Amino acid sequence: MRNLKRALSLLLSSTMVLGMVVMGGSAAGYQDVDASNDNQEAIEVLQAVGIMSGVDDAGNFNPDGSLTRNEMAVVMAHLLNLDYDYYRGVNTFTDVPDWAAPYVAACVAEGVTAGIGNGLYGGDQQITAAQAGLMVMKALGYFQNQEDFGSDWQVATIRQASYINLFDKVNSNAESA
């Protein structure tokens, strides 16, 4: 039952995160948001529980911006309550900045994300909907083995995400989130 509650909580939170990744949002306290956005409540909840905190010290959220792979690792580490402090000073990839390294390392250890090859994570790259969806679905227990993907992980991810309604109300394409 505990795992079911965790999965449902993760699914609901992830749906809110994915909606914001793609469509933007607004929340009280941010300088660059307006209350007319459909994602206001989701942003306020994620802000209140410490999962998302905005993009700078000036009080901006950047609702029309996109997330990088590094930033998504931070979101997932907070969402899953991973012990990222354990990974401070650990950097398994040559292209991950120090601020993101413990979050990326925790997500890699949990099996939520992986590098792009040759010792690189691609953390400064804009995360795609398929990549974000895969991280969420791995956290939910999907795609634990390589053979789960078939010949194309992106197609498998989008197909399964659609099947479980992960992308409901998310306006996206396979290129960017």
PLM feature spans:
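Feature responds to low-complexity, polar/acidic, surface-exposed segments characteristic
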Residues: 2-40, 52-102, 109-130, 136-177
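Conserved dinucleotide-binding and phosphotransfer motif residues
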Residues: 49
